[in-house]
Amino acid sequence: MNEQYSALRSNVSMLGKVLGETIKDALGEHILDRVETIRKLSKSSRAGNEANRQELLTTLQNLSNDELLPVARAFSQFLNLANTAEQYHSISPKGEAASNPEVIAHTLRKLKNQPDLNDATIKKAVESLSLELVLTAHPTEITRRTLIHKMGEINNCLKQLDNTDIADYERHQVMRRLRQLIAQSWHTDEIRKQRPSPVDEAKWGFAVVENSLWQGVPNYLRELNEQLEENLGYKLPVDFVPVRFTSWMGGDRDGNPNVTAEITRHVLLLSRWKATDLFLKDIHVLVSELSMVDATPELLALVGEEGASEPYRYLMKKLRARLMATQSWLEARLKGEKLPKPAGLLTQNEQLWEPLYACYQSLQACGMGIIANGELLDTLRRVKCFGVPLVRIDIRQESTRHTEALGEITRYLGIGDYESWSEADKQAFLIRELNSKRPLLPRNWEPSNDTREVLETCKVIAEAPKGSIAAYVISMAKTPSDVLAVHLLLKEAGIGFAMPVAPLFETLDDLNNADDVMTQLLNIDWYRGLIQGKQMVMIGYSDSAKDAGVMAASWAQYQAQDALIKTCEKAGIELTLFHGRGGSIGRGGAPAHAALLSQPPGSLKGGLRVTEQGEMIRFKYGLPEVTVSSLSLYTSAILEANLLPPPEPKDSWRHIMDELSVISCETYRGYVRENKDFVPYFRSATPEQELGKLPLGSRPAKRRPTGGVESLRAIPWIFAWTQNRLMLPAWLGAGTALQKVVEDGKQSELEAMCRDWPFFSTRLGMLEMVFSKADLWLADYYDQRLVAKTLWPLGKELRDLLEEDIKVVLAIANDSHLMADLPWIAESIQLRNVYTDPLNVLQAELLYRSRLTEEQGKSPDPRVEQALMVTIAGVAAGMRNTG
């Protein structure tokens, strides 16, 4: 076994040993023995020992109610520790991804070696780099914030232990700290008692900024600058920061009645307060460091006589005073006090930037570049990346809410019912009103609560400091009037600038119509004048996959993007595609580099804007070093996609994709929508109903409280199938379609697509990853334990289908086993399976006990309920992505 895996395995083994000691201290030898027996049986079962597999099932079925929770917690905590070790491994000197910042150097060298690219072209591509990461509070981050903090500390311990020069005494101290942290985690309840509020979610986002991004972003820019200097002789300008962060936490009200206008207003203030808090810490350091006397005449003129003896300090102290006054005012506002704005209130980034940049220029001019390029440069870059708002907010609302609000207004005004008008009539009315100088809203009108909420939200946007709200996203957008309606409501609220409004196309039909909708919009003169040559469109990955299956959805997403790129290029519009990806494959998740290089040519010209969801935020940005690594990967992928775009697919490949799309969609919908047994099977074979009890996000799991699979959100839909290891939404239909095309004699064509078309090879790679995490015997066990015998044939049919799908994908990829080209991921899945399997078996047992109690009309046993929640969290940790 090579060194990188042995280092990971030895850390995992060491952490497991410490956890074992903790369990023994807390609960006694007998519980540890029980856990160890189960672990050994699971390992042997994985190696193919059928007798031990049966013994594993019997042992877990026979656990007493008192043993359930300790056993569930032991395996769940072990998986959290394994994930922590793996995250550390990805940035450790012994890990294969330790050189991830090197990924930029590798990309630059690759670009320089292209005969048709020169340094000037590469430099231009660097200067136009734009990456906006949108943090969303999807309810897939199952781990509590308090435990995330402890995992970060454990990571630090692993780092110290890796130091070859560590003295025995220091090693002893670090091991002691490690034991304390693992004991603290064991004695902490891993399941939240209450759902987080939208404000709690926003605070979780601010914690990511403070604990990781605040340091990670300047570190990434130093790394980028170093590689550019070395490879191109090019220095990044001080004010060049290609990365920005936006958040949906506190702004996303789609289907979440808990996010109100008042909540958004509060989160905007809280975000500004947090920014002042973090910048105050920076300025405090600069006051201490910038004790220099030499300064340029310009700086001396700025500080006057009073500050001449220590000009830099003087300026920093003045800035500190402004930050403190701003923070006090924001604190009062957060408490609900209405105070007049103080003189010098910081509302714009320039107010922070100017004194800092004046110091920077003076230090450079006076031969103190080494000092200027230290902490001061990091702070300047933070001003550009985070600034006064810290993170900007997107507002997201469903299109029908705007339609209903306008319907209520037109009915009150006696001019008809907007909701029942044709699309042409809606557009004519909206354009007329957008061009009108008089207000539309009557003065003393009392709207319904729902309409008032929509109007109040628009008012919050109009009143927010410019630059603190990034975009207004319209979910379930279907028509040009959906976009114009939002512009009209914003105009009525008194907005004084052109707010980017992004339609989100998310079902199969909407993706197919996206280009037509945008073409109609761009043909409206008023609209063209408003957008000033820039347009953002959001592509939905989760709902389209839930609607049509993963193969049809991914092709519809590709075609929609391709058509939009060409339409905007023809119209001279700079298009920013906003990707609403999830962490799991069924919601569009894929390794960043592969995913970006598989997009249509030209899709990243306007930069990359992408959601980072739930638990993926922790995996990709949980530590400063991991942040550097993730941002470096994105940077290299954007540069490569823009300078070495993938080829346009051949027409014959497009025809094959059309074919695959139709067959896979028919297969997927044939089961999910048309098979009468499917919904009862889904409800019994997965913990879908029990998931509702988990206090995950602030958003309800269903768009409508009643209703079947259609009303279920994409996240719980995927989460449920991930739990029982069938992973159904991420593959159903895809393999059947591939098999049919192979039978039609087109296997060699598929192999060529896999070899020469990044879009197709990435799709197959994603399927392989899903297949690696799926498990036939576990899915079968859930059926045996939980599903009515009349539904067993459907379960068997689906498992047989999965087995066939694996064979066809391996044949097309010319591989003998899954993940052959990504052994690191295969190793990681293998490592965790030994600990995830017992949790799956135990979960099926707990679901059986819980449902039996309910059928008998007895009140639930809290030990069973609590253990069930722990297994759900544990399996999520084992799968490394939930929804």
Curated annotation (Swiss-Prot):
InterPro entries: PEP_COase, PEP_COase_bac/pln-type, PEP_COase_Lys_AS, PEPCASE_His_AS, Pyrv/PenolPyrv_kinase-like_dom. The enzyme has distinct binding sites for each of the allosteric effectors such as acetyl-CoA, fructose 1,6-bisphosphate, guanosine 3'-diphosphate 5'-diphosphate, long chain fatty acids, and L-aspartate. Its cofactor is Mg(2+). Its EC number is 4.1.1.31. The active site is at H138, K546. The keyword rRNA-binding does not apply. One of its GO terms (biological process) is oxaloacetate metabolic process. It is an enzyme of class 4 (lyase). Pfam families: PEPcase (PF00311). One of its GO terms (cellular component) is cytosol. It catalyses: oxaloacetate + phosphate = phosphoenolpyruvate + hydrogencarbonate. Keywords: Allosteric enzyme, Carbon dioxide fixation, Lyase, Magnesium. One of its GO terms (molecular function) is phosphoenolpyruvate carboxylase activity. Homotetramer. Forms oxaloacetate, a four-carbon dicarboxylic acid source for the tricarboxylic acid cycle. Belongs to the PEPCase type 1 family. HAMAP family: PEPcase_type1 (MF_00595). This is Phosphoenolpyruvate carboxylase. It comes from Salmonella typhi.
